[in-house]
Amino acid sequence: MSQKSTARYQGVFPVVPTIFDSQGELDLPGQLRCVDFMIDAGSNGLCILANFSEQFSLSDAERETLTTTILDHVAGRVPVIVTTTHYGTRVCAERSRRAQQAGACMVMVMPPYHGATIRVGEPGIRAFFQAVSDAIDIPIMIQDAPVSGTPLSVALLASMAK
């Protein structure tokens, strides 16, 4: 994987929950209050659209709305990592490009996953992350999430970091 950035991030980057109203619709004013609270409480950065943020229950339009609304509101006060996970390489790369264009400092991506019984081998995992990396100029945080069902060996992670 190519080196994308010399920026060094450190400190606390909590996952921002997605705020919904009583009808299950996005509550953007509530979302921005939550973001402000996390920044005012001393967060060094934020991570949006992660598993805890209910990313899998959001439509693409809702993801885009949250990404642009939050990044515009944060306006560089802290770095924001945007989760762009998708099992399809093309979709993940496009989500990552859009996150970069909106101002994300980094994207967080789970390995490709295809349900409970279909596993992607290490060559496929490497190709997936290489394609996403080639699509953007910001770093990728690889999320080793057990929910994906795709294990990432220490050796694979170390080799991709080089």
Question: Residue spans of the language-model regions?
Answer:
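Active-site beta->alpha loop and helix N-cap motifs at the rims of alpha/beta catalytic domains
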Residues: 2-152, 157
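Basic phosphate/pyrophosphate-binding loop/patch that engages nucleotide-derived ligands
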Residues: 162
